């Protein structure tokens, strides 16, 4: 491994550890000093006092395969030995990577060298394969979901190879399914919601402890538990996870996970102190008027290990664009969770124009406002009024900025802001529901958003992701489970029960219809289809079965709208605002734990 490789690899983790260490020492040295509560982003170190550096060492070499044996990795991926680039990224070396890299340099010069044979001799596919399962067509969808949790469950990774790309986790967890045989950050929140309704609270706690472990090791929650995901995160739902567990186990959970909440916040705000107006650094952006908001980012500017060939080809097809800039933006697209969507494209239609790092997204900033509020609550429960008030001020300042900067009068909805061109992107997406979900929107804005969503995004099968049919998976005509849930909860919070129920029941029909025809629940659905339950397309890989967050959201919606459980056919599921008590639900769908809406206040 070369020194430049180590240097590039270590930048994120070294910086995060140094920031955390600085914050920790600042808390010890200046515990009695006044706190900047202006909310403008200054004094982040002071605001998140008592943050110790990450306390756990990584049990594996936390270096992605493309940096451990770069020449071999590139050659294998570009030779297209495997249909899916992720296959080689997940293969386990049988000996130290440095030895394999040296052996490759010697072997490839020999006559009759076979790259495929070399890979077979030196790597093995992961043994953590999916459990054999054939769905029972006579089983109702609730029982199917409750059965699938065990199929998608993975036990603690006690025997992981030190050379594997897998980052071992100490507790059991749920994977999404199919090619995704590792934990994913934002997927897991929606999985946890469903687990609660299935009476699997202990597993929900295990999931939370796994994410806390990742923060304690690496200073942040990576995209997933793979070395090649360490350079980025995903939409920050950790605070929501803490709240979900606290609803069952009490407010002591906030104090228990306060150190990890602090580190999560430090990761997203790193680089904000002293950032000049009109500049961006890592995840933070200070607008020309001094407003501090956040963006998605990735520390590396190279092809993604899991989509290596695709990224190289995209760069080759776009020679006029700097490849490093393109690759960083493709990686940042992975951090958005919306990989990919016309939402992120400079021209609104072409992947090669992806420009995530120029955009201040509404969803990310709403989640960070919720994180700030959660930190404030944790501080108050600890009796730390000064820091609680500081975080409350930060949350209020951010919420005001969202209502002011990210409100698009042209769309009559919330949108994203291009801080480079100093203008809104004017692209309507389902992310407009995030300010409702987190309680950031004003009541008038929420009412306007509801009308816009009903008019522009509501489809026969649920809520469409965007209005653009680009061929990308996070665009029309596709609908995704998490966005349906966020919309339903947000609309319910702002007294829009009819639209919330319409979205929920249409989505339930789509899921149940597909399940009745195939015995499966899948990653995404075509919500434009005249016939409910048509599978979706688009994306860099085939449609995935399983599927973690689809199962979780459906399980919750069947509890929130119990009248849908009794329908024997999708066509029998009622639509509209009719109220039906939970007692009307069948025993199979009765909630094991009552899911409460967020405690976040609603703006006037």
Segments (PLM) and residue ranges:
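Terminal, non-catalytic domain-edge segments
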Residues: 34-47, 547-587, 592-597, 602-604
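Extended glycan-interaction surfaces of carbohydrate-active proteins
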Residues: 72-182, 206-212, 218-221, 225, ...
């Amino acid at each position: 491994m070369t020194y430049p490789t180590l240097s590039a690899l270590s930048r994120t983790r070294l910086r995060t550890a140094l920031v955390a260490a600085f914050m920790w020492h600042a808390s010890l040295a200046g515990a009695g000093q006044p706190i900047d509560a202006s909310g403008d982003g200054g004094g982040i170190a002071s605001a998140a006092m008592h943050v110790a550096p990450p306390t756990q060492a990584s049990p594996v070499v936390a270096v992605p395969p493309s940096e451990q044996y770069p020449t071999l990795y590139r050659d294998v991926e570009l030779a297209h030995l495997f249909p899916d680039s992720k296959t080689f990224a997940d293969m386990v070396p049988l000996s130290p990577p440095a030895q394999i890299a040296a052996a490759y340099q010697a072997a490839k010069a020999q006559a009759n060298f076979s790259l495929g044979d070399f890979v077979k001799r030196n790597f093995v596919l992961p043994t953590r394969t999916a459990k054999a399962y054939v769905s029972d067509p006579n089983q109702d969808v609730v029982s199917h979901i409750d059965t699938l949790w065990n199929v998608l469950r993975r036990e603690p990774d006690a025997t992981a190879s030190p050379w594997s790309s897998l980052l071992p986790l100490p507790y059991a967890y749920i994977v999404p399914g199919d090619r995704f045989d590792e934990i994913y950050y934002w997927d897991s929140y929606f999985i946890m919601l469903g687990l609660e309704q299935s009476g699997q609270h202990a597993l929900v706690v295990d999931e939370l402890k796994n994410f806390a472990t990742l923060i304690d090791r690496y200073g942040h929650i990576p995209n997933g538990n793979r070395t090649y995901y360490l350079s980025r995160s995903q939409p920050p739902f950790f605070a929501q996870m803490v709240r979900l567990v606290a609803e069952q186990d009490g407010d002591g959970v906030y104090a228990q996970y306060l150190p990890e909440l602090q580190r999560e916040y430090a990761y997203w705000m790193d680089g904000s102190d002293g950032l000049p107006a009109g500049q961006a650094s890592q995840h933070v952006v200070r607008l020309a008027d001094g407003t501090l908001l956040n963006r998605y980012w990735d520390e590396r500017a190279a092809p993604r290990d899991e989509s290596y060939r695709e990224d190289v080809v995209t760069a080759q097809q776009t020679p006029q664009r700097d490849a490093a800039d393109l690759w960083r933006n493709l990686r940042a697209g992975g951090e958005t969770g919306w990989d990919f969507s016309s939402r992120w494209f400079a021209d609104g239609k072409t992947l090669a124009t992806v420009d995530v790092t120029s955009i201040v997204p509404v969803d990310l900033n709403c989640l960070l406002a919720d994180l700030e509020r959660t930190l404030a609550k944790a501080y108050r429960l600890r009796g730390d009024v000064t820091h609680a008030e500081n975080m409350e001020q930060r949350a209020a300042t951010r919420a005001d900025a969202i209502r002011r900067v990210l409100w698009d009068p042209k769309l009559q909805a919330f949108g994203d802001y291009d801080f480079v061109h100093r203008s809104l992107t004017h692209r309507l997406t389902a992310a407009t529901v995030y300010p409702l979900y987190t309680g950031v929107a004003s009541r008038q804005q929420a009412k306007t958003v509801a009308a816009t969503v009903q008019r522009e995004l509501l489809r026969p099968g649920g809520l469409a992701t965007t209005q653009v049919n680009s061929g990308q998976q996070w665009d029309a005509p596709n609908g995704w489970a998490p966005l349906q849930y966020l919309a339903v909860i947000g609309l319910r919070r702002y007294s829009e029960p009819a639209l919330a129920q319409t979205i929920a029941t249409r989505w339930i029909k789509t899921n149940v219809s597909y399940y009745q025809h195939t015995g499966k629940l899948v990653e995404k659905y075509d919500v434009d289809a005249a016939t409910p339950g048509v599978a979706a397309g688009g994306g860099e890989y085939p449609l995935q079965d399983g599927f973690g967050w689809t199962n979780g959201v459906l399980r919750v919606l069947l509890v929130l709208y119990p009248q849908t459980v009794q329908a024997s056919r999708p066509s029998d599921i009622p639509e509209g605002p009719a109220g039906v008590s939970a007692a009307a639900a069948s025993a199979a769908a009765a909630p094991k734990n009552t899911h409460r809406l967020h405690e976040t206040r609603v703006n006037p």
